[in-house]
UniProtKB/Swiss-Prot annotation:
This is Cell adhesion molecule Dscam1. Residues 1640-2016 are cytoplasmic. The keyword Aminoacyl-tRNA synthetase does not apply. A motif (YXXP motif 1) lies at residues 1842-1845. A motif (PXXP motif 2) lies at residues 1727-1730. Residues 1-28 form the signal peptide. Residues 1826-1836, 1994-2004 have a biased composition (Polar residues).
Amino acid sequence: MNMPNERLKWLMLFAAVALIACGSQTLAANPPDADQKGPVFLKEPTNRIDFSNSTGAEIECKASGNPMPEIIWIRSDGTAVGDVPGLRQISSDGKLVFPPFRAEDYRQEVHAQVYACLARNQFGSIISRDVHVRAVVAQYYEADVNKEHVIRGNSAVIKCLIPSFVADFVEVVSWHTDEEENYFPGAEYDGKYLVLPSGELHIREVGPEDGYKSYQCRTKHRLTGETRLSATKGRLVITEPVSSSPPKINALTYKPNIVESMASTAILCPAQGYPAPSFRWYKFIEGTTRKQAVVLNDRVKQVSGTLIIKDAVVEDSGKYLCVVNNSVGGESVETVLTVTAPLSAKIDPPTQTVDFGRPAVFTCQYTGNPIKTVSWMKDGKAIGHSEPVLRIESVKKEDKGMYQCFVRNDQESAEASAELKLGGRFDPPVIRQAFQEETMEPGPSVFLKCVAGGNPTPEISWELDGKKIANNDRYQVGQYVTVNGDVVSYLNITSVHANDGGLYKCIAKSKVGVAEHSAKLNVYGLPYIRQMEKKAIVAGETLIVTCPVAGYPIDSIVWERDNRALPINRKQKVFPNGTLIIENVERNSDQATYTCVAKNQEGYSARGSLEVQVMVPPQVLPFSFGESAADVGDIASANCVVPKGDLPLEIRWSLNSAPIVNGENGFTLVRLNKRTSLLNIDSLNAFHRGVYKCIATNPAGTSEYVAELQVNVPPRWILEPTDKAFAQGSDAKVECKADGFPKPQVTWKKAVGDTPGEYKDLKKSDNIRVEEGTLHVDNIQKTNEGYYLCEAINGIGSGLSAVIMISVQAPPEFTEKLRNQTARRGEPAVLQCEAKGEKPIGILWNMNNMRLDPKNDNRYTIREEILSTGVMSSLSIKRTERSDSALFTCVATNAFGSDDASINMIVQEVPEMPYALKVLDKSGRSVQLSWAQPYDGNSPLDRYIIEFKRSRASWSEIDRVIVPGHTTEAQVQKLSPATTYNIRIVAENAIGTSQSSEAVTIITAEEAPSGKPQNIKVEPVNQTTMRVTWKPPPRTEWNGEILGYYVGYKLSNTNSSYVFETINFITEEGKEHNLELQNLRVYTQYSVVIQAFNKIGAGPLSEEEKQFTAEGTPSQPPSDTACTTLTSQTIRVGWVSPPLESANGVIKTYKVVYAPSDEWYDETKRHYKKTASSDTVLHGLKKYTNYTMQVLATTAGGDGVRSVPIHCQTEPDVPEAPTDVKALVMGNAAILVSWRPPAQPNGIITQYTVYSKAEGAETETKTQKVPHYQMSFEATELEKNKPYEFWVTASTTIGEGQQSKSIVAMPSDQVPAKIASFDDTFTATFKEDAKMPCLAVGAPQPEITWKIKGVEFSANDRMRVLPDGSLLIKSVNRQDAGDYSCHAENSIAKDSITHKLIVLAPPQSPHVTLSATTTDALTVKLKPHEGDTAPLHGYTLHYKPEFGEWETSEVSVDSQKHNIEGLLCGSRYQVYATGFNNIGAGEASDILNTRTKGQKPKLPEKPRFIEVSSNSVSLHFKAWKDGGCPMSHFVVESKKRDQIEWNQISNNVKPDNNYVVLDLEPATWYNLRITAHNSAGFTVAEYDFATLTVTGGTIAPSRDLPELSAEDTIRIILSNLNLVVPVVAALLVIIIAIIVICILRSKGNHHKDDVVYNQTMGPGATLDKRRPDLRDELGYIAPPNRKLPPVPGSNYNTCDRIKRGRGGLRSNHSTWDPRRNPNLYEELKAPPVPMHGNHYGHAHGNAECHYRHPGMEDEICPYATFHLLGFREEMDPTKAMNFQTFPHQNGHAGPVPGHAGTMLPPGHPGHVHSRSGSQSMPRANRYQRKNSQGGQSSIYTPAPEYDDPANCAEEDQYRRYTRVNSQGGSLYSGPGPEYDDPANCAPEEDQYGSQYGGPYGQPYDHYGSRGSMGRRSIGSARNPGNGSPEPPPPPPRNHDMSNSSFNDSKESNEISEAECDRDHGPRGNYGAVKRSPQPKDQRTTEEMRKLIERNETGPKQLQLQQANGAGFTAYDTMAV
């Protein structure tokens, strides 16, 4: 083994360990570049990081340096931190990241750890402050409040107990009582209840009432923000005192307080006693046992026994004593308060560069409280220094690096860093060249060379096996320095021996470092061990020694002790290279002689011994000078004992690091023995205070211990203050400094008054402050002069105090430099000047800068008065004159200067009156005035007083307005509008008031009313109407003349706007106004407001009045009705309430209607049960009976809709007894027993049991089971002439029923004829077979005969007698009903029975007659057909209006009469009835045609209706007569006579009010058009009138041309033939030319023109199937001979010029003939009305006589929204797709027969005409698209949500106009959803149908019977159908309603825009449209489109339509 090499390896290992321990101290010593620096923290993590496991946390650490430092996170023990997957990560930017984690993943070593951030670069390392990381796992916790026991009258403290695991994160935020009292922290401290800063609830002076409350605390988690109430409620247990008791303190519960600075804290003193004790708090003076009372102020308060400190400061820290006393005893408790201040540290200087060997000093400057430890680190390693100042006496290379100062306490830490750089140039030694290991033979010489470099130049030394080599005869060391500065060293060994072998080392060393090199020199030879010197080592250290072996080769090296080879214990380690290591050396076990033995392979060995001496270092025992501080003059001593350590020991003492010399400064040092030193101080003084240190030293080491000696030193002056004098205005400073221990507190006080004695604290202000005992007074003034006391107190002795006088030397001063003084003219005046300052002071007076000498004017007198503060001088003036208005100046002078003051003397008088009063502006309530300012009397005008009054009042009854004197304009407010006022003004100054100005008169303007209508009452009239009544506002608030009222209403609790109606003012004094609001929703709350208006505007809205309409009946039945059979006589019925919106009221009860199903038709047999719950049990029912049940809800309005019938059957039960029993003798041994079934079988009869028993003997009863279908039993084997008793029972599955009556029979030879069957009633169904039994017995065999209705029966094809005697009737008919009797007869006897046969057949047509009519009801009388035999269950009454759909009503069979109510007034109706029974519905009666009473409105006389003024016209609508039908509304339009366009004024004027048309021009002719509406129609009236002139006069009538008669016209023409003939001829030529051109063009485009234009063709009309897309290409192209459709924005209608074709005898292109005969109405297809005789249809009929087939022009006309001549406008595809057009399905085509027109007998085919379209201004989504119930049609009905009363007529009006299309046809109702243009809304049939002639002739009849705005809808407006896609809007038009014209044609210009707007549709709340009588399946839009395509392209369908005369319906081009 190569021993030298091994030893070299181990030495290198130890060197590496040493290098690691030294950190980075072997870095290059070259001074860094200027921009290079060590690390410095930019962002240091905070001391504590608390986070929730649900949020996680990121800790950021940033540092700067050059090069950029590396960030490493370490634990508190210095080990590096790594990633823990999912729990802890270190991001690339140096952040320590804790992701959110689950509770079960919590790890304490990760989540509850102290971390630090380490930043390092090549210049050093720094470590951040400690980062205490604490993750909080969200845990459920509950806070508790316990009972607290308290004696009445004492204070109580209730604690909120928070579990410890969340206590650090949860705080109390409030307290709550069960009486809803809430208390929060930070409230005032003078209340009974106080929440302390620490969270407790403090209750002072507890009384009995406090014991009744319960208390809960609310806590908040500061990490999660969660708040919660305590789980328990605490109470106070209040004890009544029985006897006196001393105070008792429970101090164990409360811990010392630690609070952050500027936070609030409470120190508790929980004591109780009786009587209630008093509390007093003291604070101990720091370091002493003395205490002083706590001074209470705004910051420190005492509440009962609790001391509350707000905004705590560090000075508040200390020990507090609470002393509690009452009349019985006392107690006290101490509490320590620690106020912490955040720690911070700073090292001065932060960077310093120090040359080698020079000292370096770092000072750690820190703040905060408390400071527990101060420590220093270098490059992240502790250096064991705990003083604030770190001093390095001689800087070495290894001292360079980063130094840190750490300050710590229990809560936090802080650090500061500084860098020490080395100055100059330092190059550590470097071995540049060295010797290598060598093996050689003995003899030759050896030369070892070592070359080293460095700066400064190193010195090289040599060692052999760790022992320095010195020169001798064989070893020579030499060295020199090369020119490069390297040192070359040689070791010469002469004649090397074997003993010279070993480990040679050269060491290059300079003051900046060491470098070394070692290598083995192996010399062949025997083993040799060089002598080893004695080794001394300190106990506890590690011994490392290497055996110095020579010789080569060496086989082994071992160590021995006491001849035992080592190791012999765990502490010893032996290495093959000869190294011995002993750890933790101890004297007793390790001090010995160790032997090293070296051997070679030949067995030669060498031995060498090493003596190891273990030295023990000294150890000093702790000592102290006592716990409390000593006083001056006391004796102090301390013993320094060193129990351990080798002798000799040196023991030294130091004070504050300075050595203590025996006998100096009062110190006595006594060496009691070798190990003890005594320190004595005979008399303590301030010098002796400090830190004492005892230092014990021996060769093994040093030990020390420090103890502090506190000496209480009373204050002594360092600088005692003396009297001072300062110039006024200067900054004064008076020093007062004292020394002592504890450090004295220096305070200043000022004497109260002018003499010393009583002093008060100086108030802190901006100019007075005390800093470190020095009093500073900035800008000192005379007020600061006086005696001051400086006091220094530290609690030792009585303290020091000094009284000084501070004088302020001031020149004279006037406190008031300038003032005004006034005097009334002629009165005396005194002017005074007071000068303050050092006396003597002289004062002179000047007047207007001229010396005033009283001698020159005896009116002036000057007097002086000496004051304590100065001099007062007075100038008296006996009588003031105008000339005395001047500037007087007094000048004061003393030795220090002078000052002056001025008095502006003003002699005053009253002002003159204002003038030039003018009115600048006026309004209804104010007037703006201006005036000229008058002479002010040499005194500023204080104010103007504006006086005003009403013109009729006197000036003693005035109002005033005060105006500032500096203005000449003002506004007088609070005037009443439209009132005359007189106004004047006066001026006023301090002297008096002027005279009044001249008055002006004004009249205020009118304003809108300011008052609200009064006494508003809203009462429901019925379910849809409410009456509103009110009275006018107070007369004073009219502000003019009230013209009317706006009454607004809306649904309550909605954000919709009010809908207003206008009511004219009633002039009668005190009369109540009223208005009925109609068409409201049932049982809906409405809000009503009213405002009055005059010509200026509307007044304020009244307060909302809310009212419900009357309750209605529920419109929907209860849902989810179900029944459950409980027993044989009970059924449970359950249901769910109807939807709330359909209840229409408050549901009070539910009614259950029930009856057996077979009696359900009979109303009289139905039973009713009321209940308030949602289920009920029906009792007392028939057993095993099927019941039918319905449920309905009932409100105050009545019964609601019944639910769909449900059925349940009761359970079976045992049957009743058979109804009757017969026993018939059949022979001498047989009897036939027959019976009738039980009347109530109560189930299905399973069998009968016949019981028989012989009479007179105790024989057992015999039984015989008989099947259920057998009604007789033959008993045989009976004894002759022996009576037998028989009875029968019936059985069901439940059991056997009751027994029948007993009957006795006796067998006999005589068998008379008897019939076993019973009389019965048989019911047969129409056309079915019937059989009636007649079972007979007898001997001889009886003869059976039958009689029908008393007539003997003879057999025929339908009737015959069966062998068993039964009568069989086949195919029963109605005539078969009646009595059937069967007769049986033999020679002995005869018998008979009678059956009744009832034939069930559908009822025949009943008789319907009209009994009575009213305006809204018809009364019909119903009578069944005489031929009905089957019971009639009831009637179905069918009725419909002329243009409506069929409606039905069920009528009870018992009702003789029936009222059809809710009909339209003055309308035609059709009525018929059908009967029904349990077979079904019967035949229909004849149709009854009738009408309700009433007519259209009737025109009034013009004078009674119109009242004209200059700018308005009043309309008295009460002058109109309603024709018997209530008026619904009026439409008012007007225009000037010379204008064409009508202007709509209102389209919804209520009939009960007057109406005023405003804003007319005076002296102008106007046309007025009034359209009056009721349900019978409308009437139009036009009036001409001229407004009056401005003065009220009339204007001359207009000049109208005289009307010309026919004769006049002919005469004019004949007299101008020379002009007429050429004109006529020219016109004829032009017309002929146009006709020829048209014919030629039509031939070239025959198909296209026919398709587009010739739509009025007759039965052969068709559409070119080759061009189905023609409409799409062209849109709509107007035919050449027709007026074009209107351009959007134009003002004329196209409908008036379009010609209409007529079918029948007229040509296909005939124009409209106004004289043509009926029917002017194109009737609608009606549902099939059954004709008498079961004729349900009519296949063909000559309809041409009555009907025509309208073509495309007829259908298109109403819309008038098409594009011009092929011009196409792209529509919104989403809207265009929503609307399709469909052809009519002809009445004759298809399997469904056509239907007659509405007013014709059934069976006549008809074609349904389309509804005219209309347009109006855009309205949002007003109409919905509907699909009809049958056919292919599109229906528009109002959207149900639309509810605009401004455009809605009454509900009945629109029901009145309903039209139906069931089986086909096109039906349009209403405009598109967005355009609602009145320009095109007149229905064609009314425009042209009844204008002239016909049954409804008269020029205005198209407004007549049906009104121009006849609404067409599929079903009643009460029940609109289901919504479907809305149609697209038509092209836009001009929205200017004022310029629009309904129509420019003469034929139809009477219809107005108002009519169109008026008829937009019923209100949305009218409900759903009813279905047609015979509905077909609804089709989707896509299905309809496919159907259209099929119809258009199908030849068969077209041919069929041609054959049947089918025309094409107009296409809805609104979708183009």
